[in-house]
Amino acid sequence: MAAAVLVIAGLVWWLLRPSPTVAFLGDSISVVTSPEIKTALGSDYSPDIAAVLGIQAGQMIPAGQRAAAKDPDQVVIELGSNDVLHGASLDNAQADLLKLIALFPNARCIHMVNINTHMTDNGNALGPRAGTINVALSHLHAADHRIDIVDWNQIVSADIAAHPPGGTLTDDTVHPNPAGRTLLARAIKTALDDCG
């Protein structure tokens, strides 16, 4: 009898437990993908999304501080594209991403969405600049077991290889279209689920 009560109590706790909070810090890619992210996460997670059009990594530090004050279980950072697009110092962008990560010492996992190296600006290729940020993200991943990479660049690259010349996941080489948003949201959900 006591064992049955414990099983029932455990089941009730499991059903009524709050969803783990996930802090999202992002730019316009996160703005346009927010509905798909919320759909993909369902009731498994409680997303706290702070995303601003055109924002660079360093400009999100105040929002990161506010998110950190809520002590989220996991963090998703999708920033750096505007640093690449607007010609910002990549050294500063990397330092700003480190500052954002440092705000979350208690997060179980920090998921960094890397940058699409196929972005262009008025026809000018931005791959080398985006690649520099992606290499820095890989180094962060190697240095901190909590950090992983949501490989948006690989998703876009594979799609472009299958559907040349520009692929089917973005309309402007930067922002994901509905198909791209769905794939990005699923990749984020997979990363959250794999946090161990």
Which stretches of residues belong to each language-model region?
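A short helix->loop->beta-strand "cap" motif at the edges of active sites that frequently abuts
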Residues: N106-I110
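Catalytic His-Asp segment of secreted/periplasmic serine-dependent ester chemistry enzymes
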Residues: H118-G196
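Conserved beta-strand termini and adjacent loop/short-helix elements that scaffold enzyme active sites
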Residues: A50-V52, V113, V150-I155
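Hydrophobic/aromatic beta-strand patches that form the interior of the parallel beta-sheet core
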Residues: A23-L25, H111, D148-V150
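Conserved SGNH/GDSL esterase-like catalytic core that processes O-acyl groups on lipids
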Residues: P18-K99, M119-N122, P128-G131
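N-terminal export and membrane-targeting signals
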Residues: M1-A3, T21
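Alpha/beta-hydrolase-fold catalytic nucleophile elbow
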Residues: E78, V113-N114
